[in-house]
Curated annotation (Swiss-Prot):
Substrate binds at residues 76-78, 118, 251. Keywords: ATP-binding, Ligase, Nucleotide-binding. Pfam families: tRNA-synt_2. InterPro entries: Aa-tRNA-synt_II, aa-tRNA-synth_II, aa-tRNA-synth_II/BPL/LPL, EpmA, Lys-tRNA-synth_II_C. The keyword Disulfide bond does not apply. It comes from Sodalis glossinidius (strain morsitans). This is Elongation factor P--(R)-beta-lysine ligase. One of its GO terms (biological process) is lysyl-tRNA aminoacylation. Belongs to the class-II aminoacyl-tRNA synthetase family. EpmA subfamily.
Length: 325
């Protein structure tokens, strides 16, 4: 397909037909298990505080907002879905568009399809089993292997990620020819993520999916800290064929602790000369009201379809990638 034919779809129609069938499979998977399908807003007055996520921002001008109401396109439906959980929805799932003002390329598009679901009274391990069931059904792959973050990082990078200081992480980055990228980072977690992405991820999940669990507590985000080891969080990620597919948590339900994490993120943002982000007070109010103990996971549907079709890049399975949108 020539670049001059930019009106045409990025993906072959045959792939879009197969994609539609896979999305139908996903819906049946959850409806057969009794989960409620929901739709939540694509925009919000609040957004994520995570220093590694960049949301799109717009402004609503209308009744009651003549001066302009800042709105953010959602990077995931998580906050609204948790409000539904607190309101008594029970187990629920959603297939929706999410938006991140970041990369575009082989595995990224600023607008993408997210599958997210939440299971009240599931722990992290039980939810990992359900993710594994879904991957086996859609990808016709073997059951996943499970590895702790500490185990897989130590094996491939050569140092313990839970005890290494910034200097040791920088030295490891130099050893792996990542010194230039590491030299501009002053945040320990960013160095950990650099080493994990560049050294660990390429070496796991080749023949079958790999679940990595118990990420460092400093990367807990919205996850509970493990009761087994306070150095780690009850968080997991799923990888296959060198691609990150899913990110799941045993969800934090303590509103006070969640506020502290949001505020800590914003302090980091200020230190990095990034803009502070508005905290989602509605989410915190829902947590304070009482969200059931649960686990939840977000999965990239475009990447899942790409793997199912053995496609080379996301644009092979998206009707119109960003360069043709």
């Amino acid at each position: 397909m020539s670049d001059s034919a930019s009106w045409q779809p990025s993906a072959p129609i045959a792939n879009l037909l197969k994609r539609a069938a896979i999305v139908g499979q996903i819906r049946r998977f959850f409806s057969d298990r009794g989960l409620l399908e929901v739709e939540t807003p694509a925009m919000s007055q609040a957004t994520v505080t995570d220093i590694h996520l960049v949301p799109f921002q717009t402004c609503f001008i209308g009744p009651g907002a003549a001066g302009g109401m800042p709105l953010y396109l959602m990077t995931s439906p998580e906050y609204h879905m948790k409000r539904l959980l607190a309101a008594g929805s029970g187990p629920l799932f959603q297939l929706c568009r999410s938006f991140r003002n970041e990369e575009a390329g082989r595995y990224h598009n600023p607008e993408f399809t997210m599958l997210e679901w939440y299971r009240p009274h599931y722990d992290m391990y039980r939810l990992m089993n359900e993710v594994d069931d879904l991957l086996q059904q859609i990808l016709d792959c073997d059951s996943a292997e499970t590895l702790s973050y500490q185990q897989v990082f130590t094996r491939h990078v050569g140092i313990d990620p839970l005890s290494a200081d910034k200097a040791q992480l920088y030295d490891a980055a130099v050893k792996w020819d990542l010194g230039e990228a590491a030299s501009v980072e002053d945040d320990r977690d960013t160095l950990l993520q650099l080493l994990f992405a560049m050294v660990v991820e390429p070496n796991i999940g080749h023949d079958k999916p790999a679940f990595v669990y118990h990420f460092p507590a400093s990367q807990a985000a919205l996850a509970e800290i493990s009761t087994e080891d306070h150095r780690v969080a009850d968080r997991f990620e799923a990888y296959f064929k060198g691609i990150e597919l899913a990110n799941g948590f045993c969800e934090l339900t303590d509103a006070r602790e969640q506020r502290q994490r949001f505020e800590q993120d914003n302090r980091k943002r200020v230190a990095m000369k990034l803009s502070e982000q508005p905290i989602d007070e509605n989410l915190l109010a829902a947590l304070a009201q009482g969200m059931p103990e649960c686990s939840g996971v977000a999965l990239g549907v475009d990447r899942l379809v790409m793997l199912a079709l053995k496609a080379d890049r996301l644009s092979d399975v998206i009707a119109f990638a960003v360069e043709r949108a």
